[in-house]
Amino acid sequence: MSMLFYTLITVFLIGIQAEPYSDSNVLSGDTIPQAHWTKLQHSLDTALRRAHSAPAAPIAARVAGQTLNITVDPRLFKKRRLHSPRVLFSTQPPPLSTDAQDLDFEVDGAASVNRTHRSKRSSTHPVFHMGEFSVCDSVSVWVADKTTATDIKGKEVTVLAEVNVNNNVFKQYFFETKCRDPSPVDSGCRGIDSKHWNSYCTTTHTFVKALTTANKQAAWRFIRIDTACVCVLNRKAARRG
């Protein structure tokens, strides 16, 4: 609306300056020519048409001035294709226990959006039965201070730590999983035959939709986050002789 306002003001000023002023600061002549009014009206109509017909941006969010406080249209979060079970917008830190309730992002008291089942999230997963062990040990946490990330094109982008929705500040959390130790045992991964295999644990990644900024415009982008810990195997070279 700010661009439309400035456009209308500019058109109005051009229309005024097009007519000469007398010393008494009164427009000279009896009336403004009809052709001039027609041209001015046409300019206003064109500006209004462009404002209404302009394609909607990916999301209705802009940076106000030089601040980092970004206001987001709550309808944005109703697009299910943008949801990810590893991304959460919340006004408070999410619980990390196995009996945690589902975390929803509610706007205006209406039906919740960004609904995902996170009750299974825990920092010590998975749960094994007696005698069972994980090849690699992993740890999972909700990350709330992510400021930069690598997008799907390999470029570094700025991640929005928080957004303003209906005058409420929501933090953007990422549920990340990584290896606790690259070598849970001296030989590498647990349970691997070290006589024939070299092994080590490594963190793997996936891409999730997250709110980022570029040129003072907020937008959804795929960014890379840590999501699992796996064991990498290399066969040992056979000894000759």
Curated annotation (Swiss-Prot):
GO cellular component: axon; dendrite; extracellular space; synaptic vesicle
Gene3D superfamilies: Cystine-knot cytokines (2.10.90.10)
Family matches, as Pfam families: NGF
InterPro entries, sorted: Cystine-knot_cytokine, Nerve_growth_factor-like, Nerve_growth_factor-rel, Nerve_growth_factor_bsu, Nerve_growth_factor_bsu_mml, Nerve_growth_factor_CS
Signal peptide: 1-18
Main location: secreted
Highest taxon above the source species: Eukaryota
Glycan-linked positions: N69, N114
Location(s), subcellular: Secreted; Endosome lumen
SMART domains: NGF
Positions in coiled-coil regions: none
Subunit structure: Homodimer. The homodimer interacts with a single NTRK1 chain. The homodimer interacts with a single NGFR chain. The NGF dimer interacts with a single SORCS2 chain (via extracellular domain). The NGF precursor (proNGF) binds to a receptor complex formed by SORT1 and NGFR, which leads to NGF endocytosis. Both mature NGF and the immature NGF precursor (proNGF) interact with SORCS2 and with the heterodimer formed by SORCS2 and NGFR (via extracellular domains). The NGF precursor (proNGF) has much higher affinity for SORCS2 than mature NGF.
Function: Nerve growth factor is important for the development and maintenance of the sympathetic and sensory nervous systems. Extracellular ligand for the NTRK1 and NGFR receptors, activates cellular signaling cascades through those receptor tyrosine kinase to regulate neuronal proliferation, differentiation and survival. Inhibits metalloproteinase dependent proteolysis of platelet glycoprotein VI.
Family, per entry: Belongs to the NGF-beta family.
Protein name: Beta-nerve growth factor
Organism: Cavia porcellus (Guinea pig)
Gene (name only): NGF
